[in-house]
Regions:
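Short, well-structured N-terminal submotif of metal-dependent ribonuclease cores
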Residues: 1-37, 53-62, 133-134
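Active-site flanking residues adjacent to catalytic metal/cofactor-binding acidic residues
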Residues: 3, 40, 118
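Conserved glycosyltransferase catalytic-site signature
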Residues: 5, 41, 100-101
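A general alpha-helix detector
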Residues: 7-8, 46-47, 85
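Short glycine/serine- and small hydrophobic-enriched flexible loop segments
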Residues: 49-52, 108
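Active-site neighborhoods of divalent-metal-dependent phosphate/nucleic-acid chemistry enzymes
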Residues: 74-114
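Acidic, PIN/NYN-like endoribonuclease modules and their adjacent C-terminal/linker elements
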Residues: 104-105, 109-137
Length: 137
């Protein structure tokens, strides 16, 4: 399963409109499932930079450490080939950001269908099952 930036940002930012929902969702999906949680380095970058602007250095640092140290989270790193493939996905989906296109690329590469996100723009992407709710126990 992939987890989009908007979930991490809402979870860590008390002033975010999705904060309460993310506070219920994220711990549940990380504790109840045995699935690996994936983020990309683009998601980490987008999340940490947003938190640095909207919250504090400490919050941004804690989040970066969570991405790099948690045994439940795998961060996928990009190279020149993945950047070029992401660019192609970006051109196919003009309603999504470059980070979103990168998530789509990595999901296709890993044949992963589940994405936790509050971003309804992903609903238009064939093959992705966007979720806002926790999996059943």
């Amino acid at each position: 399963m992939f987890i989009d930036s908007v979930i991490w940002i809402a979870y860590k930012n008390k002033n975010d409109s999705w904060h309460d929902k993310a506070k219920r969702l994220l711990p549940t999906i990380l504790q109840r499932t045995r699935e690996r949680a994936y983020v990309t380095d683009y998601v980490a970058l987008e999340t940490v930079n947003h938190l640095l602007r909207k919250t504090s250095f400490e919050t941004a640092k804690e989040t970066l450490e969570m991405f790099t140290r948690s045994p439940r989270i795998t961060t996928l790193y990009n190279n020149e080939d993945s950047f070029r493939a992401t660019y192609d996905v970006f051109l196919e989906h003009p309603h999504l950001s470059l980070t979103d296109a990168n998530i789509i690329f990595h999901m296709a590469r890993l044949r992963e269908r589940t994405l936790f996100s509050f971003d309804k723009g992903f609903d238009a992407v064939k093959g992705i099952m966007r979720r806002e709710d926790a999996p059943a126990q």
